[in-house]
Amino acid sequence: MNYTISQFRKEFGSEDKCLEYVFKKRFPALTGYYRVKGRKCWANAEGKQIHPLSATVFEKSSTTLQNWFFAIYLFSASRNGVSAKELQRQLGVTYKTAWRIAYQIRELMKQDKGLLSGNVEVDETYIGGTRRMASKMKNKSAIMGMVERKGKIVAKHIPDRYDSTLISEINQNIEKGSQLFTDEWGAYKKVAKMGYKRRSVQHGRKQFSRGFAHTNTIEGFWSQFKRSVSGTYHSVSSKHLQSYVNEFSFRYNHRGGQIFSALMGRI
């Protein structure tokens, strides 16, 4: 669902409108409270006060709510991510402030818990190289992805591609009995004995589809992620990689919906 910049500006054209939105978003069923003039809080007839910014990303921030909201809008409207440098330019803040805002927004994008099921494609990739070069790829990071066809994705920054690591991630994130689609990597041969069904394709032999068996969905996600990291962020440290993986997983899992509203529901 497309949420345009014109709609955004009309809805959040002032600090008061932004604050009112946060209050209603966090306390939708609350009645009997009124806005305290000149303060960022609400109170009832008994004098009990509610501070809607408390325990949110906005608490104790010197950045205006309008700038925060606009930053969240930019993240929701972009397919390729938003760099701290771009936020600095758009918001007119320091680079340090822009980086912190971007970091906090990605924290809102952490992946939900819950098991994938049905037809699930499973694959791994390296940031900055290909698996054939794995032995030469010092300082490269591995990511594992599991995606339901026409459903959700779970993607994790993993320490290695050992059998135990991959099998553990499958057990933690995919419901038993699901149909898995993988490549020929040896670890996946073990899943049939663990309550999963499996079909595979031989990427090493240039086989990318065998009837219903393919990993094209997860490969498409990798392609988008790598293009975005390279084009928008240029490079991502291993320390912060999971937060960027979360960012693109969040967009994928909320495709077709209003990402801005989904993000604001997590503040």
PLM segments and residue spans:
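Residue-level recognition of single "structural anchor" positions
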Residues: 1-267
